[in-house]
């Protein structure tokens, strides 16, 4: 679930941690490292790649952002332990996230079908729903780890989440918060703070929560 690599590390070979489905955290030294192919392929649980020996809120947030690069952001060129957290790197991260949000949801579907992945993508509707959840996950991630986040881009992230909240044609933002992070208050706090909890969907949200996560339900009722 967690690996800490030493400061003397020089290289990570091809497929080093590929298919480690339970791997959640990898601590890396902030230095140039020769990186092989597919290091974290199919490591779906991986969410945190902090720098060795660094502490504090900024360091924690950078670890979360770097952790998203190999598994969620589809941008191998951003996986640079040495550059991660620098202002230029954060700007490039946001540029890639902006590009991802602006990419039509249907992009990539035909390619996956041609590659024989019909069993994974049963139909277009399921594919589109997952793409919107993927975008919502990254919007939440960046808003909750907002080091060097510009106000203009913050508004764009908020707009995406609000347009995919409970009651919208796509409820991806609510699905991510409730179904994937049901007992994590940070997500409910972000969900409510950006404007996803409204007078129009308040009752429907509490109704869907039912008896699940009573503390989180109480939090929303107090908000």
What is each residue range found by the language model?
Residues 190, 195, 207-223:
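Charge-dense, extended regions
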């Amino acid at each position: 679930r967690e690996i800490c690599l030493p400061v003397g590390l020089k290289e990570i070979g091809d497929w080093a941690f590929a298919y480690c489905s339970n791997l959640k955290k990898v601590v890396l030294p902030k230095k140039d490292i020769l990186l092989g192919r597919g290091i974290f392929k199919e490591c779906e649980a991986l969410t945190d790649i902090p720098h060795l020996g660094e502490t504090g809120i900024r360091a924690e947030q950078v670890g979360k952002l770097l952790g998203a690069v190999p598994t969620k952001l589809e941008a191998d060129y951003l996986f640079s332990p040495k550059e991660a957290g620098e202002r230029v790197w954060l700007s490039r991260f946001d540029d890639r996230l902006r590009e991802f949000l602006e990419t039509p949801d249907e992009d990539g579907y035909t390619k996956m079908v041609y590659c024989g992945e019909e069993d994974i993508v049963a139909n277009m509707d399921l594919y589109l729903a997952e793409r919107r959840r993927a975008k919502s996950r990254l919007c939440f991630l960046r808003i909750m780890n907002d080091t060097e986040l510009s106000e203009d881009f913050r508004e764009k992230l908020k707009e995406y989440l609000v347009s995919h909240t409970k009651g919208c044609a796509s409820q991806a933002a609510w699905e991510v918060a409730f179904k994937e992070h049901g007992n994590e208050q940070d997500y409910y706090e972000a969900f409510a703070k950006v404007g996803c909890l409204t007078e129009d969907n308040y009752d429907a949200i509490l109704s869907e929560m039912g008896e699940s996560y009573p503390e989180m339900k109480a939090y929303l009722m107090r908000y």
